[in-house]
C-alpha cells in the first residue's frame, strides 16, 4: 500500500454517507434525522480535527504515517459498514412494506452500534460537534504521535422509587456484577421462593440489558439461587429478584442485604424469520438432544 493513510480518506467516506440520504426528509421521521445528525456530527468532527492539525495543508490531508496502517484499515472497514447500513435503510424505506417500521428499528439499532464503535475508534468526543483534544508526548501512543485520547463511558442509571431503596455497589473495582440489595425484610421459605423488591428503576446503555445472577456466597452457603433473571432494556418498573431457597431451612432477608448481582450485558435483536423445516440445514448432531454428547 504505497498511498499514505490519511484522516481525510475517512472523512471522504463519511461524506459519502451524507450524500446517500435524500435531500428531502420527512420531519416526522426522527429516526432517520437522528442517523443523519450523527453522520454530520462525525464529519464535522473530522473536519475540525483536520483543520486543527494541519492548517497549512490546502487539500485537507493529514499525514498519519506514524499510525499503524492496520488501525486505519480497521476504521475504513467500519465506515464501509456504515455506508452499507445506510444504503440498506434507503432500500427498505422505498419498499414501505408491512414490516418497514420494525426493520427501521433494527437498522437504527445496528447503525447506532456501528457508529458508536467507529466514534470510539476515532477517539471522537462524545459530543458530536466537539473538537479533538491533542495529547502530546504520550508514551502509550506509537512514536508519541498527537492522537487524541477519549475513553467512552457507559452509564447505567439507578432511580430510587422509595426511601427504602438501598444503594447498589460493586464488590470490587473490576467486578462484573453490581450487588443488588433488598429494600425490605423477607422470609424465604424452605424449598420455596420469594419476590424480593429492590425499589430501583434502572435504565441501561443502548444495546444492553440487565442479567440478574446469583451471588456465589448465598449459593454455596445457603442454597439460594436467582430465578427469571432477565431485565429487558425497555422495562421501566422497579426491579425485583426471584430468590429460590433450595435448602430445608427458611432464610431471613434483612433490609440492605445483598441478594443478587446485576450484570449489564450487550445483546442483539435479530429479525424473526418463519420458514419450512426443510429450509433449515441438517447438522452432524441432528436430532440428538439431552445427554447425547455425554459427560466426558
UniProtKB/Swiss-Prot annotation:
One of its GO terms (molecular function) is dUTP diphosphatase activity. Keywords: Coiled coil, Hydrolase, Nucleotide metabolism. InterPro entries: dUTPase, dUTPase-like, dUTPase-like_sf, dUTPase_trimeric. It comes from the Viruses. Belongs to the dUTPase family. This enzyme is involved in nucleotide metabolism: it produces dUMP, the immediate precursor of thymidine nucleotides and it decreases the intracellular concentration of dUTP so that uracil cannot be incorporated into DNA. PANTHER family: DEOXYURIDINE 5'-TRIPHOSPHATE NUCLEOTIDOHYDROLASE (PTHR11241:SF0). NCBIfam families: dut (TIGR00576). This is Probable deoxyuridine 5'-triphosphate nucleotidohydrolase.
